[in-house]
Regions:
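Conserved thiamine diphosphate
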Residues: 1-14
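Thiamine diphosphate
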Residues: 24-167
C-alpha cells in the first residue's frame, strides 16, 4: 500500500502523462497492507526493490505476481537463499541497475507476469535482459505468464488462464 501511495503521489507531481494501474487482486489482502512511512512519502519511478535475497536465480516480477512468486519459492521448499525476487514496481522506466546487480550474482533470470506469455510485457523485459546482459546469463531468460487467451470473467476459468503459485 505504501508503494502504491508513493508512486501515485509521484505521478501527480509529474508533468508527463502517466498510466497508473492497480491490481484489483491486491485489495483487501493482508500481505498488501503496509504502514504509511509519512504523509509526504514519494517513490521515484524506475526504482525496484529486492523482496527476497538469493544467489542462484533472479525472479523479476511486479504487482500481484510478487506474492505468488514468494509463495512459489516457499512451496518448493528450496533453500531460502537460492532465489532472489525483485519487485520492479514500475515497467517504464525499468530499474536496470537492480536487474543487472541481481543477474551478475545469479546468472539466471525468470520473468513472472500475469499478462499473456506471448507479446506481454514480460516478453519485452526478457528481450531487454537478453540484449543487455547476455554475457552474464548462464542460459536463456525464461518466462512464466498467462496462457495465450483472453482473460475470462468467470473466476474459476480465470484461475486456469492466469499464472498460479504451482506454475
Amino acid at each position: 500500500a505504501a508503494d502504491a501511495k508513493g508512486l501515485l503521489k509521484m505521478a501527480c507531481r509529474m508533468d508527463d502523462p502517466v498510466i497508473f494501474m492497480e491490481h484489483k487482486g491486491l485489495y483487501r489482502q493482508g500481505y498488501a497492507a503496509t504502514e504509511e512511512p509519512d504523509a509526504d512519502y514519494l517513490l521515484s519511478f524506475g526504482k525496484g526493490r529486492k523482496v527476497l535475497e538469493g544467489d542462484e536465480l533472479t525472479v523479476i516480477t511486479w504487482g500481484a505476481m510478487v506474492q505468488k512468486s514468494l509463495e512459489a519459492v516457499q512451496s518448493l521448499e528450496i533453500q531460502n537463499d537460492s532465489v532472489e525476487v525483485i519487485d520492479l514496481r514500475t515497467l517504464n522506466p525499468l530499474d536496470m541497475d537492480l536487474i543487472e546487480t541481481s543477474i551478475m550474482k545469479t546468472s539466471k533470470a525468470l520473468v513472472v507476469h500475469e499478462d499473456n506469455i506471448t507479446n506481454g510485457p514480460g516478453a519485452e523485459i526478457a528481450a531487454i535482459i537478453a540484449d543487455k546482459f547476455f554475457e552474464l546469463l548462464d542460459g536463456p531468460v525464461r518466462r512464466v505468464g498467462a496462457k495465450d487467451s483472453p482473460v475470462p470473467f468467470n473466476w474459476i476459468i480465470e484461475e486456469e488462464i492466469l499464472p498460479q503459485t504451482v506454475d
